[in-house]
Every structure is written in structure tokens, then in C-alpha cells.
């Protein structure tokens, strides 16, 4: 997912504490749900499920991360992907193929008792489907957390909302949020402080990326940063073979973008991709209103509907009350 710019952005990542993260956060919903589905799993790689075999990893992730966000003074608004652009069709088709292949490899690993391989392939087979989206929105409604339906890419809409001042920062693991123009991007906002990287749990800290600092430090315009992304490869184009982020940066700064692209990707027109990053489809048709969480509704959905342990749900809801110094979750608002 996203664009591989890590190698040129390392110097511009600033560790931050949770205490400095208050304000409205435009959360890249699909990216966040994908994290929940890949990380919150059982030892054999299968996601958390209820007695009916329905996946619940994302619901657990939403509940506990949102509790944590609100405890820290973060007011989240989830931004869901809309219709994918035609530019993304090839990428989506390739991802589906890889997920299907991983699903078959998972079954083979289970049959031969290879738990480690089964876990790895199960994560690779993860998909955010319509049921995951619908149940996530249902829980967000009950929690009183607003969400926005983007016309296209959620990262683009989140970036736009920060540009407008409707959110303080965007939350996503994807660096293309910067290419879409997010002034402030936050990464690694996990409850546990850990992420799975190459199958291992590693400790991570919240980190901040400020677009103006990135552009100033790299001596680039945003248009040039997009060119770097196009050379490396994005969700909308495969990139130039053998060109990594550092090489792409040198090429763009030396004025060789068009020549290198013509050499490596003959016949490819970068203009539609650049235009999509610089002028993506976004909407102003949204309302940000945080409502009163429905305690009984949350319990009914999670405990009665999806077999969540009542004590876990109660403990999460009590954290709201402890934070507010009051007896009920509703009174927190």
C-alpha cells in the first residue's frame, strides 16, 4: 500500500508523545482497518471470530483504539475510501491475485502443520471487504464517532480535511498521504506501541511528519515530491524498475524525471497520476459531530451479537468513566 518513500523521509520523522496529540484526527479508515485485521490474530494466523465464524478483529481494534484516542484528547473522524480511480485498477487486480494466492498457501500450511507459515500467509490474505466496512460504521455510530465517505481515496480526503482546518492531522501508515498534500501526518498510533514488521512484533513510537519540513529539507516542491513517488511507484503506477527513493530524489532534483521515465517506462504518461495526487476528488459534504456513545447499544452489538467477553467491553467503557471522573460513559460527553 502507498508509496515507498521511507528511505528519504527518515530524517523528517519526529517522535511524539501521546500527550502532544490532542485535537481532531482524520483517520485513514481503510488503512487502519487493514492494520487491525493483519495484527489482531490468533497464533495460527486466523483473525478473531465469533461463534458464527464472522471476523471481529476490526471491531476489537476500533473499540480499544478509540477508547485510547479519546483518553488522550484525540477526537477521531474516520475517512472511508470511495470508488477507486481507474488508475488503480491494475494495482487492485494484482493485490487480489496475491491475496488469493496467499489464501491457498495458508490452507496448505495449515494442512502440514506449519503454524509460522500459516500465520504469515493468513496476514497476506487479509482483505477489507464490504462487511468489514459496514460493521465498522455500525460500531462507530454507536460510539458517537463521525465518519466521512470519500468520493475516491480516503488519504486524499483526510489530507483535504487537514488543509481546510477541519482536522489537526491525518492518521495513516501510508506516505502517499503527504503526496496528497496533508500538512501534518501522524503514524504508529497503536494502542500497544507495537507493530508487526516482517512477522515480528517491534516497539514503535508515534511519529510526526510535517509536509513543509519535508519539502524544505529535501529542497523539493510538492509537485517534485509527487514525481519522486511516480518514479518509485505508487498505487496508480508501477514505477521505474530499479529506481528506489534515494535514486528517484537525485533524478528529480537534477531535472531528469521525464528522461528517466521515458527510458524506463516508454509510452507511460505520468500526467494523470500527478494530477490525481495534486487535484484528487474530495468532498465538502460532511458534518463533524461527536455524539453520545450508546453504552447499551455497544454491549448489545459486541457482547450479544459478536460474542465479545462482557468484562472486556465493560473494562473499555469504564476507562471513559475513569477519565471523566464520572459514573457513566454518556456523561463523558
From Swiss-Prot:
Matching SUPFAM superfamilies: 5' to 3' exonuclease, C-terminal subdomain, PIN domain-like
Free-text remark on how the cofactor is bound: Binds 2 magnesium ions per subunit. They probably participate in the reaction catalyzed by the enzyme. May bind an additional third magnesium ion after substrate binding.
PROSITE patterns membership: XPG_1 (PS00841)
Protein residues bound to Mg(2+) 2: 174, 176, 235
SMART domains linked to this entry: HhH2, XPGI, XPGN
UniProt keyword annotations, A-Z: DNA damage, DNA repair, DNA replication, Endonuclease, Exonuclease, Hydrolase, Magnesium, Metal-binding, Nuclease
InterPro entries assigned to the protein according to its UniProt record, in alphabetical order: 5-3_exonuclease_C_sf (IPR036279), Flap_endonuc (IPR023426), Flap_endonuc_arc (IPR019973), HhH2 (IPR008918), PIN-like_dom_sf (IPR029060), XPG-I_dom (IPR006086), XPG/Rad2 (IPR006084), XPG_CS (IPR019974)
Ligand binding (Mg(2+) 1): 28, 81, 153, 155
Membrane spanning stretches: none
Record EC number: 3.1.-.-
Assembly with partners or alone: Interacts with PCNA. PCNA stimulates the nuclease activity without altering cleavage specificity.
Function: Structure-specific nuclease with 5'-flap endonuclease and 5'-3' exonuclease activities involved in DNA replication and repair. During DNA replication, cleaves the 5'-overhanging flap structure that is generated by displacement synthesis when DNA polymerase encounters the 5'-end of a downstream Okazaki fragment. Binds the unpaired 3'-DNA end and kinks the DNA to facilitate 5' cleavage specificity. Cleaves one nucleotide into the double-stranded DNA from the junction in flap DNA, leaving a nick for ligation. Also involved in the base excision repair (BER) pathway.
Family named by the database record: Belongs to the XPG/RAD2 endonuclease family. FEN1 subfamily.
Protein name as catalogued: Flap endonuclease 1
Species in which this protein is naturally found: Methanoregula boonei (strain DSM 21154 / JCM 14090 / 6A8)
Underlying gene: fen
